[in-house]
Amino acid sequence: MQEKISKFEDFLTQLQQNITTALEQHETNAAKFISDKWQKPDTPDQKLKGYGNSMIIEGGEIFEKGVVAFSRVHGSELPPSATAKRQELAGKSFIATGLSLVIHPRNPFVPTSHANFRIFIAGADTDNPIWWFGGGFDLTPYYPFEEDAIHWHQTAKNICDKHDKTYYPKFKKWCDEYFYLKHRNEYRGVGGLFFDDLNDKSFDECFNFVTDCANSYLDAYIPIVAQRKNIEYSQKHKDFQLYRRGRYVEFNLVFDRGTIFGLQSGGRTESILSSMPPMATWKYNWQPELGSEEEKVYQYIKPRDWIK
Protein backbone atom coordinates (compact mmCIF):
# COMPACT_ATOMS: atom_id res chain seq x y z
CA MET A 1 0.00 0.00 0.00
CA GLN A 2 2.88 2.40 0.74
CA GLU A 3 4.09 1.98 -2.83
CA LYS A 4 0.64 2.88 -4.19
CA ILE A 5 0.43 5.95 -1.96
CA SER A 6 3.85 7.09 -3.16
CA LYS A 7 2.76 6.62 -6.79
CA PHE A 8 -0.24 8.89 -6.19
CA GLU A 9 2.01 11.40 -4.41
CA ASP A 10 4.34 11.50 -7.41
CA PHE A 11 1.37 12.10 -9.70
CA LEU A 12 0.04 14.95 -7.54
CA THR A 13 3.36 16.76 -7.23
CA GLN A 14 3.79 16.65 -11.02
CA LEU A 15 0.20 17.82 -11.48
CA GLN A 16 0.92 20.74 -9.15
CA GLN A 17 3.77 21.83 -11.41
CA ASN A 18 1.66 21.39 -14.55
CA ILE A 19 -1.21 23.48 -13.19
CA THR A 20 0.89 26.33 -11.80
CA THR A 21 2.93 26.53 -15.01
CA ALA A 22 -0.20 26.61 -17.18
CA LEU A 23 -1.82 29.33 -15.08
CA GLU A 24 1.34 31.47 -15.02
CA GLN A 25 1.34 31.51 -18.81
CA HIS A 26 -1.86 33.58 -18.68
CA GLU A 27 -0.54 36.08 -16.13
CA THR A 28 0.38 39.47 -17.61
CA ASN A 29 2.46 40.97 -14.81
CA ALA A 30 5.39 39.65 -12.78
CA ALA A 31 3.25 37.60 -10.37
CA LYS A 32 4.40 33.99 -10.04
CA PHE A 33 3.50 31.01 -7.90
CA ILE A 34 5.73 30.96 -4.82
CA SER A 35 6.54 27.58 -3.29
CA ASP A 36 6.18 27.23 0.49
CA LYS A 37 7.39 23.79 1.53
CA TRP A 38 6.58 22.75 5.07
CA GLN A 39 6.98 19.82 7.43
CA LYS A 40 5.20 19.03 10.67
CA PRO A 41 7.62 18.18 13.49
CA ASP A 42 7.55 14.49 14.41
CA THR A 43 6.93 15.05 18.12
CA PRO A 44 4.46 13.40 20.54
CA ASP A 45 2.44 16.61 20.98
CA GLN A 46 1.65 16.80 17.25
CA LYS A 47 -1.70 15.21 16.38
CA LEU A 48 -0.88 15.39 12.68
CA LYS A 49 2.49 14.69 11.12
CA GLY A 50 3.66 15.00 7.55
CA TYR A 51 4.74 17.49 4.92
CA GLY A 52 3.54 19.48 1.96
CA ASN A 53 4.10 22.25 -0.54
CA SER A 54 1.70 25.18 -0.80
CA MET A 55 2.17 27.14 -4.02
CA ILE A 56 0.62 30.62 -3.87
CA ILE A 57 0.17 33.43 -6.37
CA GLU A 58 -0.95 36.87 -5.21
CA GLY A 59 -1.34 40.27 -6.82
CA GLY A 60 -1.56 39.14 -10.41
CA GLU A 61 -3.42 41.11 -13.06
CA ILE A 62 -5.24 37.94 -14.09
CA PHE A 63 -5.13 35.93 -10.87
CA GLU A 64 -5.72 38.10 -7.83
CA LYS A 65 -4.94 35.10 -5.65
CA GLY A 66 -4.55 31.38 -6.16
CA VAL A 67 -3.33 28.39 -4.23
CA VAL A 68 -2.33 24.92 -5.44
CA ALA A 69 -1.45 22.95 -2.31
CA PHE A 70 -0.06 19.44 -1.94
CA SER A 71 0.06 17.60 1.37
CA ARG A 72 0.81 14.14 2.72
CA VAL A 73 -0.11 13.73 6.38
CA HIS A 74 -0.72 10.93 8.84
CA GLY A 75 -2.15 10.63 12.30
CA SER A 76 -2.91 8.08 14.98
CA GLU A 77 -6.67 8.67 14.96
CA LEU A 78 -9.13 9.93 12.35
CA PRO A 79 -10.92 13.16 13.41
CA PRO A 80 -14.73 13.22 13.86
CA SER A 81 -15.32 14.83 10.44
CA ALA A 82 -13.86 11.74 8.74
CA THR A 83 -15.81 9.17 10.73
CA ALA A 84 -19.22 10.84 11.07
CA LYS A 85 -20.71 8.57 8.40
CA ARG A 86 -18.32 5.66 8.89
CA GLN A 87 -18.27 4.81 12.57
CA GLU A 88 -16.25 1.64 11.91
CA LEU A 89 -13.25 3.87 11.18
CA ALA A 90 -13.32 5.64 14.55
CA GLY A 91 -10.01 5.35 16.35
CA LYS A 92 -8.06 4.10 13.33
CA SER A 93 -4.76 5.56 12.22
CA PHE A 94 -4.73 7.20 8.79
CA ILE A 95 -2.71 8.56 5.91
CA ALA A 96 -4.11 11.33 3.70
CA THR A 97 -2.47 12.56 0.51
CA GLY A 98 -4.02 15.19 -1.71
CA LEU A 99 -3.84 18.24 -3.93
CA SER A 100 -6.29 21.09 -3.42
CA LEU A 101 -6.56 24.28 -5.43
CA VAL A 102 -8.65 27.44 -5.56
CA ILE A 103 -8.12 30.17 -8.16
CA HIS A 104 -9.58 33.65 -7.56
CA PRO A 105 -9.30 35.73 -10.77
CA ARG A 106 -9.27 39.53 -10.64
CA ASN A 107 -11.73 40.03 -13.50
CA PRO A 108 -15.35 39.41 -12.35
CA PHE A 109 -16.12 37.83 -15.72
CA VAL A 110 -13.63 35.02 -15.08
CA PRO A 111 -15.11 32.43 -12.70
CA THR A 112 -13.42 31.11 -9.60
CA SER A 113 -12.45 27.47 -9.89
CA HIS A 114 -11.79 24.82 -7.25
CA ALA A 115 -10.45 21.28 -7.51
CA ASN A 116 -9.36 18.62 -5.07
CA PHE A 117 -7.99 15.10 -5.50
CA ARG A 118 -7.07 12.91 -2.54
CA ILE A 119 -6.64 9.44 -1.12
CA PHE A 120 -7.31 8.29 2.44
CA ILE A 121 -6.03 5.09 3.96
CA ALA A 122 -7.40 4.11 7.36
CA GLY A 123 -5.52 1.50 9.33
CA ALA A 124 -2.55 1.66 6.97
CA ASP A 125 -0.43 -0.03 9.63
CA THR A 126 -2.76 -3.05 9.81
CA ASP A 127 -3.14 -6.16 7.66
CA ASN A 128 -6.44 -4.86 6.24
CA PRO A 129 -6.13 -1.17 5.39
CA ILE A 130 -9.25 0.60 4.11
CA TRP A 131 -8.63 3.00 1.21
CA TRP A 132 -10.79 5.41 -0.72
CA PHE A 133 -10.39 8.30 -3.14
CA GLY A 134 -12.21 11.61 -3.20
CA GLY A 135 -12.20 14.76 -5.25
CA GLY A 136 -13.69 16.64 -8.16
CA PHE A 137 -13.81 20.16 -9.54
CA ASP A 138 -16.41 22.93 -9.52
CA LEU A 139 -16.91 26.37 -11.05
CA THR A 140 -18.20 29.57 -9.42
CA PRO A 141 -19.07 32.29 -11.95
CA TYR A 142 -19.99 35.84 -10.95
CA TYR A 143 -21.24 36.94 -14.37
CA PRO A 144 -21.90 33.62 -16.05
CA PHE A 145 -21.79 32.56 -19.67
CA GLU A 146 -23.84 29.51 -20.57
CA GLU A 147 -21.24 28.23 -23.02
CA ASP A 148 -18.64 28.20 -20.23
CA ALA A 149 -20.80 26.01 -18.00
CA ILE A 150 -21.55 23.69 -20.92
CA HIS A 151 -17.83 23.35 -21.72
CA TRP A 152 -17.02 22.73 -18.04
CA HIS A 153 -19.63 20.00 -17.71
CA GLN A 154 -18.90 18.44 -21.10
CA THR A 155 -15.25 18.08 -20.09
CA ALA A 156 -16.36 16.44 -16.84
CA LYS A 157 -18.77 14.10 -18.62
CA ASN A 158 -16.21 13.06 -21.23
CA ILE A 159 -13.70 11.97 -18.61
CA CYS A 160 -16.35 10.18 -16.55
CA ASP A 161 -17.80 8.32 -19.53
CA LYS A 162 -14.35 7.02 -20.39
CA HIS A 163 -14.41 5.06 -17.11
CA ASP A 164 -18.05 4.54 -16.13
CA LYS A 165 -21.15 6.09 -17.71
CA THR A 166 -22.90 6.17 -14.33
CA TYR A 167 -20.23 8.44 -12.85
CA TYR A 168 -21.16 11.80 -14.43
CA PRO A 169 -24.85 11.94 -13.43
CA LYS A 170 -24.02 10.59 -9.98
CA PHE A 171 -21.04 12.86 -9.28
CA LYS A 172 -22.71 15.92 -10.85
CA LYS A 173 -25.71 15.51 -8.54
CA TRP A 174 -23.39 14.99 -5.58
CA CYS A 175 -21.55 18.20 -6.50
CA ASP A 176 -24.79 20.20 -6.73
CA GLU A 177 -25.86 18.91 -3.33
CA TYR A 178 -22.49 19.39 -1.67
CA PHE A 179 -21.78 22.99 -2.73
CA TYR A 180 -25.01 24.30 -1.25
CA LEU A 181 -25.23 26.97 1.45
CA LYS A 182 -28.11 25.76 3.59
CA HIS A 183 -28.34 28.93 5.66
CA ARG A 184 -28.66 31.03 2.48
CA ASN A 185 -30.70 28.57 0.42
CA GLU A 186 -28.20 29.21 -2.37
CA TYR A 187 -25.88 27.10 -4.49
CA ARG A 188 -22.24 28.16 -4.69
CA GLY A 189 -21.88 27.95 -8.45
CA VAL A 190 -22.64 25.80 -11.48
CA GLY A 191 -21.10 22.67 -10.00
CA GLY A 192 -19.09 20.05 -11.81
CA LEU A 193 -17.99 16.80 -10.18
CA PHE A 194 -17.76 15.75 -6.54
CA PHE A 195 -17.08 12.26 -5.24
CA ASP A 196 -15.95 10.70 -1.99
CA ASP A 197 -15.52 7.19 -0.57
CA LEU A 198 -14.60 6.02 -4.08
CA ASN A 199 -13.52 2.37 -3.87
CA ASP A 200 -16.25 0.68 -5.92
CA LYS A 201 -13.67 -0.77 -8.34
CA SER A 202 -10.12 -2.06 -8.01
CA PHE A 203 -7.45 0.29 -6.69
CA ASP A 204 -5.89 0.67 -10.14
CA GLU A 205 -9.24 1.43 -11.79
CA CYS A 206 -10.07 4.07 -9.19
CA PHE A 207 -6.54 5.47 -9.41
CA ASN A 208 -6.80 5.80 -13.19
CA PHE A 209 -10.16 7.56 -12.99
CA VAL A 210 -9.01 10.05 -10.37
CA THR A 211 -5.79 10.86 -12.22
CA ASP A 212 -7.64 11.31 -15.52
CA CYS A 213 -10.14 13.55 -13.76
CA ALA A 214 -7.33 15.59 -12.23
CA ASN A 215 -5.58 15.98 -15.58
CA SER A 216 -8.80 17.25 -17.16
CA TYR A 217 -9.03 20.27 -14.82
CA LEU A 218 -6.82 22.39 -17.05
CA ASP A 219 -8.79 21.33 -20.14
CA ALA A 220 -11.94 22.53 -18.40
CA TYR A 221 -10.65 25.82 -16.96
CA ILE A 222 -7.93 27.30 -19.16
CA PRO A 223 -10.17 27.92 -22.23
CA ILE A 224 -12.60 29.85 -20.01
CA VAL A 225 -9.79 32.00 -18.58
CA ALA A 226 -8.45 32.71 -22.07
CA GLN A 227 -11.89 33.67 -23.36
CA ARG A 228 -12.90 35.99 -20.47
CA LYS A 229 -9.75 37.51 -18.95
CA ASN A 230 -9.71 40.62 -21.18
CA ILE A 231 -13.38 41.60 -20.84
CA GLU A 232 -13.70 45.17 -19.57
CA TYR A 233 -15.50 45.57 -16.25
CA SER A 234 -16.73 48.37 -14.00
CA GLN A 235 -16.53 48.99 -10.26
CA LYS A 236 -20.12 47.72 -10.03
CA HIS A 237 -18.99 44.39 -11.48
CA LYS A 238 -16.07 44.23 -9.04
CA ASP A 239 -18.31 45.07 -6.07
CA PHE A 240 -20.65 42.21 -6.94
CA GLN A 241 -17.74 39.80 -7.31
CA LEU A 242 -16.54 40.74 -3.81
CA TYR A 243 -20.06 40.31 -2.43
CA ARG A 244 -20.38 36.84 -3.96
CA ARG A 245 -16.92 35.93 -2.69
CA GLY A 246 -18.41 36.33 0.76
CA ARG A 247 -20.54 33.28 0.03
CA TYR A 248 -17.38 31.39 -0.88
CA VAL A 249 -15.90 32.25 2.50
CA GLU A 250 -19.08 31.18 4.31
CA PHE A 251 -19.13 27.81 2.60
CA ASN A 252 -15.46 27.07 3.24
CA LEU A 253 -15.64 27.92 6.93
CA VAL A 254 -19.03 26.38 7.72
CA PHE A 255 -19.49 23.37 5.43
CA ASP A 256 -16.32 22.35 3.61
CA ARG A 257 -15.18 18.90 4.75
CA GLY A 258 -11.55 19.51 3.86
CA THR A 259 -11.36 22.70 5.92
CA ILE A 260 -13.11 21.07 8.88
CA PHE A 261 -10.94 17.94 8.63
CA GLY A 262 -7.77 20.00 8.49
CA LEU A 263 -8.64 22.12 11.50
CA GLN A 264 -9.94 19.19 13.57
CA SER A 265 -6.88 17.06 12.86
CA GLY A 266 -4.35 19.75 13.74
CA GLY A 267 -3.40 20.55 10.17
CA ARG A 268 -1.35 23.50 8.98
CA THR A 269 -3.71 26.45 9.39
CA GLU A 270 -1.89 28.75 6.97
CA SER A 271 -2.30 26.20 4.17
CA ILE A 272 -5.87 25.24 5.11
CA LEU A 273 -7.07 28.85 4.96
CA SER A 274 -4.98 29.84 1.94
CA SER A 275 -8.02 29.18 -0.25
CA MET A 276 -9.76 32.26 1.14
CA PRO A 277 -10.16 35.11 -1.37
CA PRO A 278 -7.91 38.16 -0.91
CA MET A 279 -10.94 40.42 -0.54
CA ALA A 280 -14.63 39.82 0.13
CA THR A 281 -17.54 41.95 1.33
CA TRP A 282 -20.83 41.53 3.14
CA LYS A 283 -23.80 43.88 2.78
CA TYR A 284 -26.74 43.82 5.14
CA ASN A 285 -29.89 42.47 3.48
CA TRP A 286 -28.69 43.41 0.00
CA GLN A 287 -30.86 42.40 -2.96
CA PRO A 288 -30.02 42.74 -6.68
CA GLU A 289 -32.17 44.98 -8.84
CA LEU A 290 -34.92 43.21 -10.73
CA GLY A 291 -33.82 42.35 -14.25
CA SER A 292 -30.18 43.25 -13.59
CA GLU A 293 -27.14 41.19 -14.57
CA GLU A 294 -26.65 40.46 -10.90
CA GLU A 295 -30.14 39.06 -10.44
CA LYS A 296 -29.66 36.68 -13.37
CA VAL A 297 -26.78 34.99 -11.56
CA TYR A 298 -29.13 33.61 -8.91
CA GLN A 299 -31.24 31.89 -11.55
CA TYR A 300 -28.17 30.62 -13.34
CA ILE A 301 -26.48 28.89 -10.40
CA LYS A 302 -29.36 26.54 -9.69
CA PRO A 303 -28.78 22.86 -10.62
CA ARG A 304 -29.67 22.03 -14.20
CA ASP A 305 -28.79 19.63 -16.97
CA TRP A 306 -26.09 21.59 -18.79
CA ILE A 307 -25.57 18.96 -21.48
CA LYS A 308 -28.69 18.70 -23.60
Curated annotation (Swiss-Prot):
Binding of substrate, residues: 100, 116-118, 266-268
Q: Please provide the Gene Ontology terms (biological process) for this protein.
A: protoporphyrinogen IX biosynthetic process
- Its Enzyme Commission number(s) read 1.3.3.3
**Residue numbers spanned by region Important for dimerization:** 248-283
GO CC term, one of those recorded: cytoplasm
Tell me the enzyme class: oxidoreductase
**PANTHER family hit by this protein:** COPROPORPHYRINOGEN III OXIDASE, MITOCHONDRIAL, OXYGEN-DEPENDENT COPROPORPHYRINOGEN-III OXIDASE, MITOCHONDRIAL
Name under which the protein is recorded: Oxygen-dependent coproporphyrinogen-III oxidase
What's the source species for this entry? Francisella tularensis subsp. holarctica (strain OSU18)
What high-level taxonomic lineage is stated for the organism? Bacteria, Pseudomonadati, Pseudomonadota, Gammaproteobacteria, Thiotrichales
